[in-house]
Curated annotation (Swiss-Prot):
Membrane topology category: Multi-pass membrane protein
Secretion signal span: none
Listed transmembrane segments: 8-28, 51-71, 102-122, 158-178, 207-227, 246-266, 274-294
Protein name: UPF0182 protein SUN_1015
Superkingdom: Bacteria
Keywords recorded for this protein, A-Z: Cell membrane, Membrane, Transmembrane, Transmembrane helix
């Protein structure tokens, strides 16, 4: 045994040393990274909180459990052999070994192990502890206990943790004490009775008192947790919760405190019947008040009068949910629909028409991949919609050309290539949302490598070291030249000239990162110099989450080409909680499961070249971000500090807009009776994409809102009634200053049928000429892709636009071949949007493209020539119908009428131009 003891100790010490070194390396490597980023104070705050919380709860467990087990071990040994054991009792063999220093050391190791576990468990709640220390007020009190909402978000989570942690500690200690007394034969079960020594009985009783105290605290917490009840017709406390559950919890709480006192003082009066009676009464009261009584109240008081009883609680739920999701700030405006716009209105809203997004992001990314990846190792992970000021305000789609981890061919996947040479992507691709080439491709205004542009856009530094697909570490400023971009048959190489990454000049730092990344090549490579840097956490989502793990993030970061010629990423960040009182949680969302509070309080900017990250507070009134500013004073900057050229590109985030739309579909109903009956429930409509149906996505568009003078960049979505296809509202979020963040819902008249997206889709499918052409394409071996259907409000009307793409079976490049436009009862499909609009509004071809060529005075919103051209076209169509029916008389009549109109048009143009008259 002695021969084995020394190797075991040495092995244990070696394992412990390796663990400590690994822990140190991990934290030190991260600290260097935080310091390089300028946010070492954030790292220090988080680490210090983790350490202090670990030490505090570690010591509490050591003291509590250690004292009790020490008392049980020594107290039990004094009563050893006082209770006789049966011959087959396993303790007969264990008891002789249960003595001496070895047993004491064994208990010490067990206590130490659980203390480490419980301390680590506590340190995981560092975020809650910091919020507890630096709370902020919401200035909103819930009506049940009169507590500010901040109590539930900043204070209650710590109370919950402390109570659960305390109960775990008591249970673990109780099991340890019970085990010690059992081995020491301080108690025994026989067929006739239960034997236990006085010391063991008193000790176990007092431990039970500690447990009863925890139960009292647990029911105190349960009182406040009623604010998250789901028993009633609406989330939060219901009539039954307030009038039955709360009194029951108070009763159990008081009784638990009484039992705690009785158990604590049991050693002094030793009346077992009192304890047994109290515990029996507690069980009866619990069964009656907590289990049976609430059911009686619900069945016989609430259900027969549910609406009346639940009305005040429904109102509470509506109020707090609307506040938590920012729905109370939505402006409601009527949108009077008469569908009477004319060609003149289309021309007056030409800027809106020119920014209708014909390029659906899903087929467009395939086009980008095929046309602009240039080399097989590049990739476009996503494309995003934004707007730029060129010669005019233009909506564009753009994507960043990144170099993903596995982009280079498998045979070239060497350590040097992966980490030293192929270090970054290069450039962006950009196209206006509605411009198409003659062969159905997007009209690229930024393209190729090195980037070329046909617009006034400064392109200076386009290397992408930090992006959405940059997942592995790279080493820069090494003796190996980095691949910059391809140029013809050759490659251009460069050396990194920025400040991104951690300097890795010393041997110790190389050892640290070799250990951290489990990559010994970092230690032994000969390519590193004193100027070399290691870049990691390069994925922008991971990067911001590492810097600010207490924030939640939008799933759609987007690239921005700055006026300084550099590429940036803008990432929306949210403050969230699942503890806002009375607020309905949302479980199915792209941000965080079960949240019931969200605020887009922070905009994050990431430099794609240097990796610099800046956190700008756009909503300083948010209490959660106020708390984070107190905790991390050096992390956040006021939004006013953001460069103006980046402010021009902030947009309302789609994830938040989707969440708010889902919640508003229910919580626009502020009348409790309407809410109770769910009689005005709204839905996000379906749309057809490719060949299947899916929920419609919100879309960005530049348009002029009702009662405004100028076009602006907005995010919008149409809304339909539940299980209906007609449209009854549309919701938009304004993205441009000074109205950024303003939400408006435009409600449509209930006495009119306004077509929704699926009704328009049905009308499209019913058009023989459209369906036959699409079917023919499909039969010829091409895949027909119907893109996003866009509902476009113009004045007091709607037009509907749907692009149609064609993708051959052999190729992967979708081509935009047709555009469908619907207005009122007319549906037309043409090669371009202008042609489709001309067809829908019966305008002579070419006038949409050249509206300035139309001559004559404006009459009723249309020019004289436009009206006469429309008449001539009508006579021509009637003449052709007569010809097909062999009605020669009517055919001649319609031709004469058409000739008369054309002569009138010619004379009108002659007067305005001074040309000779046509006879």
């Amino acid at each position: 045994m002695k021969k084995l003891k020394k190797p075991i100790i040495i092995t244990a010490l070696a394992i412990f040393t390796i663990y400590l070194f690994s822990l140190f390396v991990d934290y030190y490597g991260d600290w260097l990274w935080f310091k390089n980023m300028g946010y070492d104070s954030v790292f220090d705050t988080i680490l210090l909180t983790k350490i202090l919380s670990f030490i505090l709860f570690f010591l509490i467990f050591i003291l509590f459990s250690g004292i009790h087990i020490h008392f049980a071990y020594h107290g039990g040994s004094q009563s050893r052999n006082n209770i006789p054991l049966a011959d087959d009792d396993p303790r007969q063999k264990i008891l002789p070994l249960y003595q001496g220093k070895a047993v004491a050391w064994l208990w010490a190791v067990i206590i130490l192990f659980f203390a480490i576990v419980m301390g680590s468990y506590a340190s995981a709640y560092w975020h809650d502890f910091l919020k507890f220390i630096y709370p902020s007020s919401f200035d909103l009190k819930e009506p049940i206990f009169g507590k500010d909402a901040g109590f539930y978000i900043f204070t209650l989570p710590v109370y919950q943790f402390v109570v659960s942690w305390y109960l775990f500690m008591v249970v673990i200690t109780f099991i340890g004490v019970l085990s010690s007394y059992y081995i020491d034969t301080a108690f025994n079960f026989t067929s006739r009775k239960f034997n236990i020594t006085g010391k063991a009985k008193s000790h176990l009783t007092q431990l039970t008192a500690f447990f009863a105290l925890g139960v009292s605290a647990l029911y105190f917490i349960k009182l406040y947790n009623i604010l998250y009840s789901s028993h009633g017709v609406a989330y939060g406390p219901s009539y039954m919760d307030v009038h039955a559950q709360i009194p029951a919890y108070w009763t159990i709480l008081v009784m638990s405190l009484i039992i705690t006192i009785l158990l604590f003082f049991y050693p002094f009066y030793k009346k077992r019947k009192v304890i047994v009676s109290a515990l029996g009464l507690w069980v009866l009261v619990w069964a009656g008040f907590v289990w049976i009584y609430p059911g009686i109240v619900e069945q016989y008081i609430v259900k027969p009068n549910e609406l009346k009883k639940e009305t005040p609680y429904i109102l509470n739920n509506i109020k707090f949910t609307r506040t938590a999701f920012g729905l109370d700030n939505i402006k409601v405006k009527p949108f009077s629909v008469d569908q009477n716009i004319t060609y003149k209105d289309i021309l007056d809203n030409r800027h809106t028409i020119e920014n209708i997004r014909l390029w659906d992001r899903r087929p467009l990314i395939q086009t980008y991949k095929q046309l602009q990846e240039i080399r097989l190792y590049y990739d476009f992970k996503n494309v995003q919609v934004d707007r730029y000021h060129f010669h005019k305000y233009t909506e564009v789609v753009l994507g960043a050309r990144e170099l993903p981890e596995l982009g280079i061919p498998a045979r070239a996947q060497t350590w040097v290539n992966n980490h030293l040479i192929y270090t970054h992507g290069y450039g962006v691709v950009m196209n206006p949302v509605n411009e198409i080439t003659s062969d159905g491709m997007p009209e690229l205004i930024v393209k190729d490598i090195p980037p070329t542009t046909s617009v006034n856009l400064n392109i200076k530094q386009m290397a992408i070291y930090y992006g959405e697909e940059t997942n592995q570490f790279v080493l820069v400023n090494t003796r190996a030249k980095e691949f910059d971009y391809p140029k013809g048959d050759d490659n251009v190489y460069a050396s990194y000239a920025g400040k991104g990454g951690v300097q890795i000049s010393s041997l110790f730092r190389r050892l640290v990162y070799a250990w951290k990344f489990s990559d010994i090549n970092i230690l032994f490579t000969g390519y590193l110099t004193k100027q070399s840097r290691i870049m990691f956490h390069r994925n922008i989502m991971q990067r911001v989450a590492t810097l600010a793990p207490f924030l939640s993030f939008d799933s759609q970061p987007y690239p921005v080409v700055g006026k300084d010629g550099k590429l940036y990423w803008i990432q929306d960040a949210y403050t969230t909680s699942n503890m806002f009182p009375y607020s309905e949680p949302l479980y199915h969302n792209p941000i965080e499961r079960g949240i019931n509070y969200i605020n887009n309080s922070v905009k994050i900017v990431i430099d794609a070249y240097d990796g610099d990250v800046s956190f700008y507070v756009i909503n300083p009134k948010d209490p959660l971000v106020q708390t984070y500013e107190k905790i991390y004073p050096k992390l956040f900057k006021p939004f006013s500090n953001m460069p103006g050229f980046l402010k021009a590109h902030i947009r309302y985030p789609t994830d938040l807009f989707n969440i708010q739309t889902k919640m508003y579909n229910v919580y626009h109903m502020t009348d409790p009776k309407v809410f109770y009956n769910q009689e005005d429930y709204w839905e996000i409509p379906n749309e057809t994409y490719s060949r299947g149906e899916q929920k419609m996505f919100p879309y960005y568009i530049i348009m002029r809102l009702p009662d405004t003078k100028n076009e602006e960049f907005i995010l919008m979505i149409p809304i339909t009634p539940s299980k209906k296809d007609n449209m009854n509202a549309w919701l938009c979020a304004r993205c441009d200053a000074p109205n950024y963040g303003e939400l408006i819902v435009y409600t449509l008249p209930k006495d009119k049928l306004i077509y929704g997206p699926m009704q328009i889709q049905a009308r499209i499918n019913q058009q023989p000429d459209i369906s036959s052409e699409l079917t023919l394409w499909g039969q010829q071996g091409s895949r027909v892709i119907k893109g996003n259907q866009l509902v476009i409000p113009i004045k007091n009307s709607f037009i509907y636009v749907e692009p149609v793409y064609l993708q051959s079976e052999e190729g992967q490049i979708p081509e935009l071949k047709r555009v469908i436009v619907a207005f009122k009862e007319k549906v037309e499909m043409r090669k371009t949007l202008d042609e489709a609009l001309e067809a829908v509004f019966n305008v002579a071809p070419g006038q949409m493209a050249n509206p300035q060529q139309s001559a004559g005075k404006h009459v009723g919103g249309r020019t004289v020539l436009s009206i006469e051209a429309h008449k001539a076209l009508e006579h021509y169509n009637k003449a052709m119908d007569s010809l097909r029916q062999n009605d020669w008389a009517n055919f001649g009549k319609e031709l004469d009428e058409m000739k008369s109109v054309l002569l009138k048009m010619t004379q009108s143009e002659t007067k305005s131009s001074g040309m000779p008259k046509v006879k």
